[in-house]
Amino acid sequence: MSELETLERTLLADIDAAADEGAIEALRVGALGKKGSISELLKTLGTMSPEERQTRGARINALKNIVTEAISARKLALKDAAIAERLARETVDISLPVRSSPAERGRIHPISQIVDEITAIFGDMGFSIAEGPDIETDYYNFTALNFPEGHPAREMHDTFFFQPDENGERKVLRTHTSPVQIRTMEAEKPPIRIIIPGKTYRQDSDATHSPMFHQVEGLVIDKTANVANMRWVLEEFCKAFFEVDQVTMRFRPSFFPFTEPSFEVDIQCDRSGPIVKFGEGKDWMEILGCGMVHPNVLRAGGLDPDEYQGFAWGMGLDRIAMLKYGMPDLRDFFNADVRWMTHYGFRPLDMPTLFGGLSA
């Protein structure tokens, strides 16, 4: 075995046995430093003949490259090993159960909880969720919903208008979630069964009104939808939402531009105590509006009212949350008060289901 082969084996064995970066650095200096073993061999190239320099010089340079690569590889291996050891030392078992303790501060806002509850109920009936933009055109917010220009019903909405654009058109903060009905009819073919939860905006603010509030509405479109179907859907919803076995409802004639006939729906309840109890008592409370979709709205959605018909309903999420969970002031929903959230909020992992209980 030649001198260079012996030196190569010795250096590679020492490098492989190095336990830390300090040992690796000492080996590098001993082999490749100014007075290292390989550096000393390179100094002898000047005393060699051209033929010897061509053969032996090439072998010395090859040895230098091999040792340099081995040192770099060992440094990288030691660094990877150190990272792996640290990761193992600092591992957190994410499979541990959530501990119920005073440190558990996060709560689900009641509005988010109500949306999840309503989604669970209507999802069980075969409805899907639809969404749309908060900033709407005048067409989708009013005209397509049978509010023509100058219609007196437009005065019922204290609307937030944006400045006119270059074409003179003013966009609005939507005053209801109904524009999504038109957008859905334009994009999908019947049968349609959707609910539309979302934010809406009107210029109003007191204990029971807010400039920004939440609504949910539903829409059913097919060839045979009728008032009896609508009544059944709403009764089943109220029983599930208020978690009672039976509800008594009354439908009062009303007026909405986008439905005909239109109804306001009251539910029987007991208001004699501090908490409203549903499914019993002799009192009545209005909870939503509904009706059969107006033929003009169907036409605006691209459907033939001689072939299709449907029904729709809408209710305020904030209002039904207040009724169900006994919250006295709507403005508290938006105050970001941690104490209020601790009292009225919900545990993050308690997802509402019909099987497990909506508000358990």
From Swiss-Prot:
GO terms (BP aspect): phenylalanyl-tRNA aminoacylation
Location in or out of the cell: Cytoplasm
Keyword Ribosomal protein: no
Residues annotated as signal peptide: none
GO cellular component term, pick one: cytoplasm
Molecular function per GO: ATP binding; magnesium ion binding; phenylalanine-tRNA ligase activity; tRNA binding
HAMAP family in the cross-refs: Phe_tRNA_synth_alpha1
Record-stated family: Belongs to the class-II aminoacyl-tRNA synthetase family. Phe-tRNA synthetase alpha subunit type 1 subfamily.
The protein's name in its UniProt record: Phenylalanine--tRNA ligase alpha subunit
Originating species: Sinorhizobium fredii (strain NBRC 101917 / NGR234)
Gene: pheS
